[in-house]
Amino acid sequence: MKLSEKINKKTIIYPLGASSKEDALHELLDYFQSLDYLTATTKLFSYLSSKDKIFNSVASRGVAYHYHTSIEVNDTLAVLGISKKGIDYNATDGLFCHFILLILEPMNSPNSHRKLINLFQELIKNPTIKSNLLELDSSNEVEKIIIDWENSDNSFDIL
């Protein structure tokens, strides 16, 4: 799997308009719904919010990850929101999150999010790429950085 197969100009919200963790989650879920991947978002928001209270979303180094299974999806889907100002996720390192990744996976593949998170972490661990992503003007430019990274020697595929 290549990162650009899941995160591309169609699935990137740039800039993310949310100013809180809850608003970010709503915005990402609503975006999935606008792409006709979901018919409604209320239950998923409730599940993700309650899961977050128990496990706390993975958030550090300016990145937050949400993931859940859904009966409405047949393939692993992702939407990436990028916030220039950052959002307080109560991260253990105290940093605001600028990159919020929401992954929905089918019921029969409850661990497929791990592959996608690993790929995204490989991209974002490059400090130049990370800072460049916050300076762009559109989701098209974000997609170009992802594709350029994939075409470089620094990326890898995960089966």
Predicted region positions:
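Cytosolic covalent-transfer regions centered on His/Cys nucleophiles
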Residues: 1-159
